Amino acid sequence: MNAAAYKQNFQRTVQKSDIPTCNIMGVDIAAIDMEWLLNYLSGNIKDLAGDYICVSNVHTTVTAYEDEEYCKVQNGGIMAIPDGGPLSSVGQRRGFENMKRITGPSLMGEIFKISAEKGYRHYFYGSTDETLEKLYKVLTETYLGIQIAGMYSPPFRPMTAEEDEAIVERINETNPDFIWVGLGAPKQEKWMAAHQG
């Protein structure tokens, strides 16, 4: 299965128009705060299956401004959250008073805190085996009851179509609620867009 096939099969069941946004250099950045985001995710977790969220900062926003295809990737998920302080500052100056910085690590921490209670399952894709082992140890010691569905460190080279299909099947078999992708920008956003659905 190739990337195009994933996109053809994906049909969003929630409305992007329900999310307030501030367009910054062509990227629709969610004009929200952490509380709004956590409530939204908790209330729509099943409907968001197969979708993605970009954690956007100044670097990714400028890159999207300069690269039309990457801009489509940034805008193609359910939302792009304001990881960069300057993004939320621009939004606030434009009248979006509730637009606050939401860093990737802070979002992860907040999701992990409620995961045992909500029964959320997590899959981690990216980095090295050593880093994933350390992450597993920290998460299971810090967030009691967290369900880690799986972890995978992809090769540091382009994957073959067969390898990609195998890992997608492996991830799907674990039935995660969240797939945390750590490949570095812009690679991670492109991976999420290619595997949307």
Which residues make up each language-model segment?
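Short amphipathic alpha-helical segments
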Residues: 66-67, 92-94, 136-137, 191-194
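Short, well-ordered beta-to-alpha junction loops that form the rim of enzyme active sites
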Residues: 57-58, 126-128, 183-185
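Conserved acidic residues
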Residues: 78, 149, 177
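Conserved beta-alpha
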Residues: 88-174
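N-terminal nucleotide/polyanion-binding subdomain common to many enzyme families
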Residues: 2-101, 105-106
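A contiguous pocket-lining binding segment that forms or flanks enzyme active sites
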Residues: 163-197
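Short, solvent-exposed amphipathic alpha-helical segments in soluble enzyme
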Residues: 68-72, 138-141, 196-197
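N-terminal hydrophobic signal-anchor/signal peptide
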Residues: 1, 119, 195-197
